[in-house]
Design a protein with these regions (language model features):
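Bacterial N-terminal signal peptides that target proteins for export
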Residues: 1-12
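Hydrophobic alpha-helical targeting segments used for export or membrane insertion
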Residues: 11-20
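Small-residue-enriched, tightly packed secondary-structure blocks
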Residues: 27-229
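Sec/Tat signal peptide C-region and signal peptidase I cleavage site
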Residues: 20-26
Length: 229
């Protein structure tokens, strides 16, 4: 009798454990999808904030020349991506059919130079050359090695021409622009976020170059409206 009761308890516990594990697995994709959607919303808000800042005159004057924008709403010191500093980013870029995206990326390195006392910053990287855009279509991009980078000019009437770099990067922390060194930073496609957002396996080439991935334009519209208008 005791043995049967014990076996029954074990069976109930095992069944409950399997059910909880199944629920956790089911919840993970849903959470990742929600995280990807939130990242798109946050990226739109980040771009809008940078765009409206009167000191970022260069950004507004050169938007038409840009091949794309890689936006990271939050880069965290000692982040989760590469063990140093890291965060997620989205790319909206010009493809053969016009503006495409978003494509999702991880950005991080052990050596991004944060200012003293800074632990979080936001980043808008302006893709200025075809080489820069092509490098984002690869499996991994290292700033400074695979593509050149320059800090974005800040101030009205300053540095509005003459920058020769594949990426012009604006960073902001504690309300101030600049101060971060992105030489050596690594950018990689985020396969899990791309899959979660589009509900299928896809690459930045599928999303940006081929424009072959159907997606919810309504969800993307705030980000697209800010960049493609």
């Amino acid at each position: 009798m005791m043995k049967r009761a014990f076996r029954g308890i074990v069976l109930v516990l095992v069944t409950a454990g399997l059910a909880l594990a199944g629920s956790a697995r089911a919840a993970d994709p849903e959470k990742k999808t929600a995280d990807a959607q939130k990242l798109v919303v946050d990226a739109g808000a980040t771009f809008d904030e940078f765009w409206k800042d009167r000191d970022l005159e260069w950004l507004r004057k050169h938007k038409a020349d840009a091949k794309g924008f890689l936006i990271a709403p939050e880069i965290v010191k000692a982040g989760f991506v590469f063990g140093g500093s890291g965060g997620r980013a989205v790319l909206v870029a010009k493809g053969p059919k016009g503006w495409e995206g978003p494509a999702f990326y991880s950005m991080g390195t052990a050596s991004v130079g944060f200012q003293a006392g800074v632990s979080v910053m936001t980043v808008v990287a302006v893709v200025m050359t075809q080489k820069g855009l092509d490098s984002l279509m690869s499996s991994s991009l290292k700033f400074g090695a695979d593509a050149s980078v320059a800090a974005g000019p800040v101030g009205v009437g300053t540095g509005v021409s003459g920058i020769k770099a594949d990426f012009v990067i604006y960073s902001k922390a504690k309300g101030l622009y600049g101060g971060a060194n992105f030489e050596g930073a690594v950018v990689k496609p985020s396969e899990d976020f791309n899959k979660a957002y589009y509900s299928q396996d896809c690459t930045p080439i599928d999303i940006i170059v081929k424009g072959s991935v159907p997606h919810n334009k309504a969800a993307d519209s705030p980000l697209f409206w800010r960049i493609a208008k």
